[in-house]
From Swiss-Prot:
InterPro entries: FAD-dep_OxRdtase_2_FAD-bd, FAD/NAD-bd_sf, FRD_SDH_FAD_BS, Fum_R/Succ_DH_flav-like_C_sf, Fum_Rdtase/Succ_DH_flav-like_C, SdhA/FrdA/AprA, Succ_DH/fumarate_Rdtase_cat_sf, Succ_DH_flav_su_fwd. Its EC number is 1.3.5.1. Keywords: Electron transport, FAD, Flavoprotein, Membrane, Mitochondrion, Mitochondrion inner membrane, Oxidoreductase, Transit peptide, Transport, Tricarboxylic acid cycle. This is Succinate dehydrogenase [ubiquinone] flavoprotein subunit 2, mitochondrial.
Amino acid sequence: MLSLKKGITKSYILQRTFTSSSVVRQIGEVKSESKPPAKYHIIDHEYDCVVVGAGGAGLRAAFGLAEAGYKTACLSKLFPTRSHTVAAQGGINAALGNMHPDDWKSHMYDTVKGSDWLGDQDAIHYMTREAPKSVIELEHYGMPFSRTEDGRIYQRAFGGQSKDFGKGGQAYRTCAVADRTGHAMLHTLYGQALKNNTHFFIEYFAMDLLTHNGEVVGVIAYNQEDGTIHRFRAHKTVIATGGYGRAYFSCTSAHTCTGDGNAMVSRAGFPLEDLEFVQFHPSGIYGSGCLITEGARGEGGFLLNSEGERFMERYAPTAKDLASRDVVSRAITMEIRAGRGVGKNKDHILLQLSHLPPEVLKERLPGISETAAVFAGVDVTQEPIPVLPTVHYNMGGIPTKWTGEALTIDEETGEDKVIPGLMACGEAACVSVHGANRLGANSLLDLVVFGRAVANTIADTLQPGLPHKPLASNIGHESIANLDKVRNARGSLKTSQIRLNMQRTMQKDVSVFRTQDTLDEGVRNITEVDKTFEDVHVSDKSMIWNSDLVETLELQNLLTCATQTAVSASKRKESRGAHAREDYAKRDDVNWRKHTLSWQKGTSTPVKIKYRNVIAHTLDENECAPVPPAVRSY
């Protein structure tokens, strides 16, 4: 009890749930097929909405729903502020006009061009129009943006961004918190989630969607702390689980980026979209893959080859080092192939920052100065950083409308069809605002704009507190059977061996440059790796804090994403954005301006491919005209 004034006391009994919510119903134990028989304790919960993932997109959706009065559960396999959003460095795009006059329509033009005309223009219209409002909202929540001398939000230059629809030179549109923007955003959003009493279930590993007659009705999850299984009933299930960068050997992604939500959706019989488009960031630290933000080039850094040449002037005469990421990554790869790489093996290039004033490095780039020292042994004030293109982002994911509703294809009409009960946002989703190539600093924007869109859509379509329909008592038991099979796997291959084989295959065969031969070999190799999962060995048979089990379940998810990535890439016979074919060197809008949809029900099953049209119109053509396809040059 806290004494406020004489005779007045206040009791603080505010409940915030971090590991479990009040149990709605605990049902009997379920026997497994293992010998001796094991038992799984299943606990049922009922919520209006459940959000899977507690990064930027998941938190924004979750607290938006809680704030609107919905009983909301947020599941995360790790503590929310350890989500991969924390690693985003450079900033968040919005046409605030703090450094020069700017217009969100120019931002839209740059995003469509950056997507290589594969982005859906209704969603891009919505995102860029909402961007200024979203950034100001973050500021009001307390996000500590860097400031100009007159107190406005500081904005830096980033790749692929221009003034006046590509005619006015480099735009300064990226709002930054030094080089730790994602860290600041994640903590800001987490604070709002706590304020609005979101129910958190932390260190719960979501295994599968619960479906009933084609409708998603919740998720089933494994509580790593006590080994119990939890079924979460929900009228709306939101997937915000991030990307699957760990399918590759060298990536900037956290070890937790394993495509869990994508694989859950795939196992439920729904499609994934555009998985062939994997972004390679131009500046991962050579040898470790740690990210050096594009903001380093935005502040004036530049790339050098072994001859000391600023080679980007040959590949992108206007934008130079601030061309879009796919262009810069290909240029670096071509320099290395031409023998102009640096180092003993001539297999990387250099990022020069030592010419920048020390105060700029200290104020604007403190994090990467430390990262370069720790992971490359480099003092950025004295010497360049060795860098190499590194897997960074998945443009593909769960096909989603700009409202956040997940999509599939109607078997009879071939038209888009909303999946009842399922929504997605963030890197797990494919809205598609990034198309074939994401612009730097559009990812943090994507998180908050579409996380909020999910909450708004649900608020417009669902009444809080509605009762749940009765379901079969054995719903989710197929997922438990898979958990039991994996936990008791007694094969000859360690999880780490299979994972390494997958990562090496993807790194070699589905990389920056692709040909039909390498892609076909990649499909064969990843299919063989996929089959070896049946021979996996899990040493730890327990249910409590079993990291061996969790990593094996994550590998199962990664294999689903990796296989569909390789197959989708082998089918697309053109070069567009991050998908660069040496045997089909040009973009083909007539035959290939369309989204790839892929289905795969489970590990070691065939991948089915279909296509859906790119949305070439905006939300309101009187407000904003669509951007017609054109030659993409920087």
